[in-house]
């Protein structure tokens, strides 16, 4: 039962992340899970998923929107990661 609950939570979090929520929002949801191995695994998975930015190659303008949102700079896709312009 615990595995099914963890899988359901994981899939829900992946869905939320793909909708444009940032890692900090999803980590707040992870904090609601009791402190155990499942929680630490979910935290690591959410962190890795947030770093890869799967929308980068799939959606035109994704990185520009992402970089404007977090740094107020232009951005471009580089592999599976967004690169924001430097000063």
UniProtKB/Swiss-Prot annotation:
User: Which compartments is it annotated to reside in?
Assistant: Secreted
Q: Name one GO molecular function term.
A: toxin activity
Question: Which stretches of the sequence are propeptide?
Answer: 20-27
Keywords, alphabetical: Disulfide bond, Ion channel impairing toxin, Neurotoxin, Potassium channel impairing toxin, Secreted, Signal, Toxin
Question: In what tissue types does this protein appear?
Answer: Expressed by the venom gland.
Please indicate which superkingdom the organism of origin belongs to. Eukaryota
Q: What is its main location?
A: secreted
Signal peptide segment: 1-19
Would you tell me the protein name for this molecule? Potassium channel toxin Ttr-beta-KTx
């Amino acid at each position: 039962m615990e595995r099914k609950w963890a899988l359901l939570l994981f899939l829900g979090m992946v869905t939320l992340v793909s909708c444009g929520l940032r890692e900090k929002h999803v980590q707040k949801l992870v904090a609601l899970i009791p402190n155990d191995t499942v929680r630490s695994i979910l935290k690591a998975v959410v962190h890795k998923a947030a770093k890869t930015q799967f929308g980068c190659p799939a959606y035109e303008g994704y990185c520009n929107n992402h970089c404007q949102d977090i740094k107020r700079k232009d951005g471009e896709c580089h592999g599976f990661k967004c690169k924001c312009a430097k000063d």
